């Protein structure tokens, strides 16, 4: 049975919700799924004063965990059109795994959130995907088999490169039903690909 890791960073809970949806989709495909988050780099007093969501249930990942999975789906909010520094810092520690080729052939995917429709969703996904390709991973996006990609009757995230959500400038908008459906679809597709490749 394929093992899938949903690895995320979420300051305010939007990506945490998307990570749970990705995991639901992967489980639906028959994979064993773990959800883990990367360490917070913001000092605790600053995080609390900034109203970060500090009660997230997922355990904190270690870089060595990555080698234990057949698929790794990476999610993080955007910071100026690229992945958040917390995720970048974590992935930057994978040099030893990269040098050994420990991630070659694993399935990868990316998901993100931005404050606005044009807040850097695709560039943030690319910043994650670039890392996955350097690791030698097989990248799976959010294909157009997901009909929600074509919705024009509502503001919604989603790109062929990965599932996305729009949070609003003040963070008050939570992932919509369509955005969560996209995350589930991508999780299922990634797990199905991992099962085909790794059994």
Curated annotation (Swiss-Prot):
PROSITE patterns: FLAVODOXIN_LIKE (PS50902). It comes from the Bacteria. This is NAD(P)H dehydrogenase (quinone). Residues 4-190 form the Flavodoxin-like domain. Belongs to the WrbA family. Its cofactor is FMN. The keyword Nucleotide-binding applies.
């Amino acid at each position: 049975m394929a093992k899938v890791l949903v690895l995320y960073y979420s300051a305010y809970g939007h990506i945490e919700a998307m990570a749970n949806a990705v995991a639901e989709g992967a489980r639906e495909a028959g994979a064993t799924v773990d959800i883990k988050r990367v360490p917070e780099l913001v000092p605790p007093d600053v995080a609390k004063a900034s109203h970060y969501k500090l009660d997230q249930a997922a355990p904190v990942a270690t870089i060595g965990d990555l080698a234990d999975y057949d698929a790794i789906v990476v999610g993080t909010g955007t910071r100026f059109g690229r992945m958040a520094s917390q995720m970048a810092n974590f992935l930057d520690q994978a040099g030893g795994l990269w040098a050994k080729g420990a991630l070659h052939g694993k399935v990868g995917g990316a998901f993100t959130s931005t404050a606005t429709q044009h807040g850097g969703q695709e560039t943030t996904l690319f910043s994650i995907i670039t890392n996955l390709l350097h690791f030698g991973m097989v990248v799976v996006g959010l294909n157009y088999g997901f009909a929600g990609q074509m919705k024009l009757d509502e503001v919604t995230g989603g790109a062929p490169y990965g599932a996305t959500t729009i949070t609003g400038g003040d963070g008050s908008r939570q992932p919509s039903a369509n955005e969560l459906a996209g995350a589930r679809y991508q999780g299922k597709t990634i797990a199905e690909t991992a099962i085909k490749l790794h059994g």
